């Protein structure tokens, strides 16, 4: 698959740092590196572009928003490939006029001079729009920071629409031989080393299809979406060392590894151009069918305000049989709290009065005359739809194949979710499936496609 890129040509001059990433430092007077000549390197940084045309479906392409491709700063981290892994680090910024767009090319960014380092085989890393916490961690830990050590940071910092989205190398770099570095600045300026980077977050948007329908006897308004169960930590470089892409919590996780997520963005119509997206860090875990838990995955929450068309009321304040209830049109406005009694005949019975719902359920359980059967206990609080809000969960990427795993989300992917149908009333709480195995989407029908950043579309019936 082709992915459109922005090209940033980097000509960066760096002072050689004297420290290494090891706990014990070499004596500079005895360090043979001091006798090695200076060399130079320039770079082409390939940044994924949000406005490219790339889709696995026949749907229109998605331009994204400008903030997703904003470039504010660039850090280059160079390390000797041999111990003590001597570092060379430099920062370039647009505000400081050391990083600028190439004339006539909005996809290319240029620094104003090459990077100077000592001649040796090197590991070279590029970081775009890095915040202070990330930079400090890398400079303190040296090359070890890139050796698949998890780093904690909130998604609002990784997908920062003011300071730019964080990006790193799209794969762990191979060693750059010393012979590929140049002893003349002019040679370095003419022969760029190329590095591709990816955003470290995934994004999502939800749309209703042209034929979107609400089943369940009522109307649905104010549909919203957002990622839930977001990873708190991530690797700077995606772990592709084995057959499957892995995360730090691949085969073991704790509830505290995740934050809940609070995005509630309005669902778009099929013809809309989205202006807001929900973002989430990568979450690559070992999926086992029937065993893997919802608490270990990152998923999309869909909510909506449901108004039942018909409700059950009582004609007797002390009902004793089915004859004491009647079905009426619901005259309450949208956003009114309602209650549900799901009977054994798989019918969702709606109520506006909670006490009536409880009476109805009690008589069903007791097998009263004219009442449908109800098995088990009824808890009114668990069937209360406050302000009419109901929830559905969409587990994306269920058909993923190697090197991806089912229900995993990966950096630089855009999950475009098309909702075809919803089976109301859904669930009264967004936490309805906590500590349960991941199940196929049953009350929401949606298609989801996934493509590196530009588009991954999925259709769902909820």
PLM features: what roles do these ranges have?
Residues 22-125, 130-164, 168-180, 199, ...:
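Acidic/polar, low-complexity intrinsically disordered N-terminal segments immediately downstream
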Residues 1-7:
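Bacterial N-terminal signal peptides that target proteins for export
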Residues 146-207, 213-214, 233-256:
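Flexible, low-complexity coil/linker segments
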Residues 15-18:
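C-terminal motif of bacterial Sec signal peptides marking the signal peptidase cleavage site
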Residues 61-138, 203, 207, 211-416, ...:
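Tryptophan-paired
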Residues 6, 20-21:
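Charged, compositionally biased non-catalytic regions
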Residues 313-314, 427-430:
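Short conserved micro-motifs at the rims of enzyme active sites and ligand-binding pockets
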